[in-house]
Amino acid sequence: MTAPTTGPVPWANRLTKLLNQFHAVHGGDRFPVDVEMLIRQTPEQFQTGEPIAIQGQAMDPEFEGALFNLNAGQPDKGNWAIIYNQAISSLGRIRFTLAHELGHYLVHRHLQESFNCSEADMLHWDSTERKMEGEADLFASYLLMPIDDYRKQVTSNTVDLDVLGGCADRYGVSLTAAILKWLEFTPKRAVLVMSRNGVVQWACGSESGKWLSIALNKKLPNGQRRNLSEQSATVLHAGANVDRYGTEVDARVWFPSEPAGMALREMRIVSDQYRQTMTLLILPQEIKPWERDQSDEDDADDTDDNGGLENAFDRILNGQPPVR
């Protein structure tokens, strides 16, 4: 088997360039990406000599997809197959899974002969497998949601679940995948929180919000995951499954170290199918601790100055000279 020479992002960018050129000449919808067509044409396009077959089957709900070599044990005779779970109801998840397996084919097929991908398996992957799975996800996200195009879809300063949902529809992916991609490039301080039964399962932050997500992902001293605050809108309005535009909440409800008076915007969608709640938090620009201290000092100075003026006026009114 010929070893690929580039990583997940360069491979995705190469395919993106080819797709842009194809649609510029032949027209048709650029998005969502027809991943099945791309998979079938990739071996010929890049002359790998290792064809890929695709087959969907109804399988266990936890299984998502797999890539394996039908000629295992025969070097340089790769004949690959991708199997995906046809029982998954979300076409966006299926599209992402297929792109993920294509990423394994392009980036990792020289490293091993089979890739079995399911969320449950993550608990048992070693560091090498985790790295490869992360790279396959990265490839899929760049292929399906090119950042330069994504930026053009999010031009308003106000971002909500309607805006991001429109991007999910454009790219034919799940809302979760669309939000995670947005977090990669947004300058906003934002965190996506996935919870189940009021307990944080995981959190992912933007570049400026990564420390906030780290705080939510950190387990308690007893080893348990953190509960959502009882004062969060997600808990207070648990009966309402959707809040696409957001409710203003004191930032300290979620992040106690944030300054007093700061409010964040909390949006959420409850998925009955997956028995979990997705909450998106968007915060104002960070106020550094030393900036808070300076602000407090300025407030104190203002108070002292005003107090001094009041005392001086009082003395004058009382016929006394002001203190100099």
Residue ranges with predicted function:
Residues 1-324:
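Active-site hotspot residues in diverse enzymes, especially metal/ion-binding acidic/histidine motifs
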